[in-house]
Structure formats: structure tokens, C-alpha cells
């Protein structure tokens, strides 16, 4: 019989960073915000977080020619996944996004968000602003 590790794959993360919630050793946390209701006549930005994660798999984590450190290890980077939301429910999406960013900030990590459209800046700024008034 196969073990769970042999049967199930882990979610794609940014640059292969560990998946999970930020803790004491994490200085930064990736958060996807798959939202595109702030754009008119053109949807698709909600696919941004997944696309960025897929493309980041092509990046080398350490390249001594350009940088003498591994950003994932140096930052203790963790990928929290994406905010679970329904794109058509704008108020709910913003509330959930603000709560997700708030949890990252309260854990002492810097949120690195991958949108979505530009409107997701509003709930992100609200959450960060609560901590840094």
C-alpha cells in the first residue's frame, strides 16, 4: 500500500517555499489573492497567483553570480496559499483578504501578496495599517 506522501502532491508554492502558516522563524509570507472584480470588461487577473507560482518554479533559489543568498532560506519564506473567496462577492472577498493579511502581520511576518487586480491593495493596506499606525 502506498503512503500518503506517495499518493498526494503538495500544493505548488512560490519558489518551492514551504506551505503553511507563518510562525516565529518566518520573516515573510506569500499570500495569493485570486480576485478580479475590480477590472471591467476583462477577467483573468484572478489566475495571477497560480501563474506566478508556476513561473517561479523556473527560478533558481540560489545564484552566486547575482546574489549570495537563498531568499527562501534567508527570509524563512512560507507560502500561505491563496485566500479562499468567491470573486463575485466583493465585500466578503475584501473582508477575507484583510483577515488573512492581518494573521500574517500578527505572526510577525511581512505579507507578500500576489494579486489579482489592483483593488486588492485596499484590504491589504487596511490590515497592515492596523499594525503600523
Regions found by a protein language model. Name each.
Residues 1-133:
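Metal-dependent C-N hydrolase catalytic cores
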